[in-house]
């Protein structure tokens, strides 16, 4: 089996780039950071849910757009992590620092452009996507979107800065920033939502402040000289278009993949919005639980980009394949545990969130299906692609993910809801089909070895 998956004879087992201990030291802080990032969205939704289903639905709908935008920034961070990891793997810290400066410039320009567009076209955008929702939900959505859109540059800069630290093997520092940020967010929610009765506006302002804190802190500490990647003298940065092109060669396909994924979710969300406020609220909470039970496994994938990227940069292709297999196994283990734990705590959390009985029962039924299907299908469909991206095979991942998203997940969900009378469970039936087909396609791609013919730098 090892010879089929990787050539063990070409790996220097006495001089591995990452030991098992070092892998977990990299992965655990990323898991904590990702959990805290998810908790920020969960805190908004749960605390707003006590104001009522209208407010909860507004936050859920707008966060589906916010997630789309954040995924664009995550794609740029993916490019940052892979490019910088390759440079560091080959021992070229000067090249890594030069790339980091260009990534910073690119992130600033793109995030400010998206923010300006969001603020200008807020109302027509929301009416286009969620025109069928109740007027009260729409008004709350507009308020929440205008404020959270102002935080886009901050979250973009923090994502890029965190990617620089992780590329250098330091995943603890971004985690520490996230811990403080989430404490600020929860305190802000409590004060503004309940103390000042500001509803969705309070949740949005709290999110804005906490994201601004993250960006300011990470940019300040990137100026310190005693680390692998140093970023300072921001005003002296000038565009290096060939280098920006290398970053975008990774970032654009990853961004298109993430963007199409989120557009698909918006299409599904638009369909679910026709089922009424109870179904929207149930789906919103189910999405939160599904995000939570996959956080640890996603963190493994994020860590894999650094690990495989450095291995490829050092020219150790078989060792990179070994890490992809090993970390896919890690992801499966943490996925089984997190799905079980999330399911066990789901009912108390739904009660704590003040969900209405009908929404709660719908949510619980969907969560049962997710807890069974996700450990079987998810890991092979998502973790190996992180390794393929680290090798520069981003276009194949983009095409595959886009096709399975639209032709399986979206098409099946829309068909079942609009033509077969299904409720929100149709969303998850489509998702399970998507995961299953992805896992087959990416397994075949990995075994073919064609993905290792790509070049990053």
PLM-predicted stretches and their roles:
Residues 35, 39-57, 126-135, 191-198, ...:
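Helix-terminus/linker motif at the lipid-water interface of multi-pass membrane proteins
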Residues 56-116, 155-174, 280-346, 378-401:
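Small-residue-rich hydrophobic transmembrane alpha-helices
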Residues 1-27, 84-151, 195-252, 308-374, ...:
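Short alpha-helical transmembrane segments in multi-pass integral membrane proteins
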Residues 25, 48-67, 135-140, 200-201, ...:
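Interfacial/gating helices of multi-pass transporter permease domains
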Residues 77, 147-166, 174-182, 203-218, ...:
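Short runs within selected transmembrane alpha-helices of multi-pass transporters and secretion channels
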Residues 25-44, 147, 181, 210-214, ...:
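Transmembrane helical elements of multi-pass membrane transporters/channels
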Residues 14-46, 50-51, 67-79, 83, ...:
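N-terminal transmembrane alpha-helices
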Residues 30, 34, 45-46, 82, ...:
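Transmembrane alpha-helix boundary and packing residues in multipass membrane permease domains
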């Amino acid at each position: 089996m090892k010879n089929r998956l990787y050539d063990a004879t070409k790996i220097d087992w006495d001089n591995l780039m990452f030991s098992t201990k070092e892998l977990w030291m990299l992965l655990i802080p990323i898991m904590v950071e990702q959990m805290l990032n998810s908790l920020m969205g969960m805190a908004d939704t749960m605390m707003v849910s006590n104001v009522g289903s209208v407010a909860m639905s507004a936050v859920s709908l707008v966060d589906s757009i916010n997630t789309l935008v954040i995924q664009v920034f995550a794609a740029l961070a993916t490019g940052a992590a892979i490019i910088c990891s390759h440079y560091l793997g080959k021992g070229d810290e000067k090249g890594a620092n030069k790339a980091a400066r260009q990534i910073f410039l690119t992130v600033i320009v793109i995030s400010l452009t998206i923010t300006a567009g969001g603020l200008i076209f807020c109302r027509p955008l929301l009416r286009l996507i969620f025109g069928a929702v109740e007027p009260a939900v729409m008004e709350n959505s507009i308020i929440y979107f205008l404020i959270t859109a102002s935080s886009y540059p901050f979250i973009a800069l923090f994502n890029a800065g965190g990617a620089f630290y992780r590329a250098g093997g330091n995943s603890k520092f971004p985690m520490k920033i996230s811990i403080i940020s989430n404490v600020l967010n929860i305190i802000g929610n409590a004060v503004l939502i309940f103390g000042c009765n500001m509803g969705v506006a309070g949740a949005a302002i709290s999110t804005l402040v906490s994201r601004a804190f993250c960006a300011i802190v990470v940019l300040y500490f990137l100026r310190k000289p005693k680390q692998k990647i140093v970023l300072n003298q921001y005003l002296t940065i000038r565009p290096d278009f060939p280098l920006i092109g290398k970053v975008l060669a990774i970032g654009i396909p990853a961004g298109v993949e993430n963007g199409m994924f989120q557009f698909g979710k918006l299409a599904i969300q638009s369909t679910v919005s026709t089922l009424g406020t109870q179904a929207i609220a149930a789906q919103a909470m189910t999405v939160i639980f599904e995000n939570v039970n996959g956080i640890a496994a996603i963190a493994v994938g994020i860590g894999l980009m650094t690990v495989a990227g450095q291995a490829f940069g050092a020219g150790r292709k078989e060792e990179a394949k070994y890490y992809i297999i090993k970390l896919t196994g890690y992801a499966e283990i943490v996925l089984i545990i997190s799905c079980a734990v999330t399911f066990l705590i789901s009912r108390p959390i739904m009660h704590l969130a003040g969900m209405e009985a009908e929404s709660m029962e719908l949510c619980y039924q969907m969560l049962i299906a997710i807890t069974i299907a996700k450990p079987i299908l998810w890991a092979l469909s998502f973790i190996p692609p992180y390794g393929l991206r680290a090798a520069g095979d981003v276009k194949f991942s983009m095409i595959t993910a886009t096709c399975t998203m639209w032709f399986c997940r979206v098409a099946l969900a829309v068909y079942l809801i609009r033509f077969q009378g299904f409720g929100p469970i149709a969303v998850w039936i489509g998702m399970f089909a998507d995961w299953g087909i992805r896992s087959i396609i990416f397994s075949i791609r990995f075994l073919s070895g064609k993905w290792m013919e790509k070049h990053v730098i």
